[in-house]
Amino acid sequence: MIDFIKVEELANKDRIRELLDFGMELTREEVVNCVGPEGQKHIKESFESGIVVNKTTGELSQRKRHARLKGLIFTLIPGGRGMRMQGSLHKFSNGGEKNNDRFTFDDFLAVAEELEDYISPRDRINVIEIGLNVRTPYPPGHFLKSLICHKGNRFNLIDLWDEKRAEAWHKQYRIKIYDKSLHQGGEKTLRVEVRVNKMQWFRSSFPEGLTWADLQRPESWATFGQLLLRTFSEVLYYDPTINKANLSPAELRIIEEGNNPIY
């Protein structure tokens, strides 16, 4: 259900900074040779960055420093002003490779345990993407073409070679509905996602803000599911199977004008 997240301010800065500093002071080969098996695993999987201090002048670099771990990106802001993380937790659970299988609450708990040295329970989530897969008896692309709007905001249909999707944007969040069949081995699958960019959208459910600890509670996942269902129920779409010959003039007008979200 949870995929992408972004945390703007991580509490465990020292732990992440140690990895960044260690990886930058030595070459990759030197790092691999002088750390233990677990350290080698981390370095080989992920960590990469630029120079922090010019060894000739002693000047601090103003470049952001990045570390990549199974698809997650940790970023240190110049001058040590902040540390953030972003990426797909679903892909992380698959070694950073894919997110086309199921990602359950238990899978997330395993991810949280693996990341406990890097993300603190009190770290606040700034962006999160939640979604669910729906099996359909028809090609999902047909449903995408029937989408009209969500709360007055039109859906934009985007047709790419590897993905067909429809998006409706709001100030605090974005709804994305797309055909995931290509990623599911051809099985007819519709994906419904809500990407929350402003945590005010969660205010009624998480009045104190959404934290990493909240994500580790099953009741939070139940809340996400309810929000997804409510949001999807608010989507306005047209049913192309309606027989117009059996409609009254008033009903026919609704069909003809219904693709206008202002109507």
Regions found by a protein language model. Give the residues of each.
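Structured, helix-rich domain cores that form ligand/interaction pockets
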Residues: 1-262
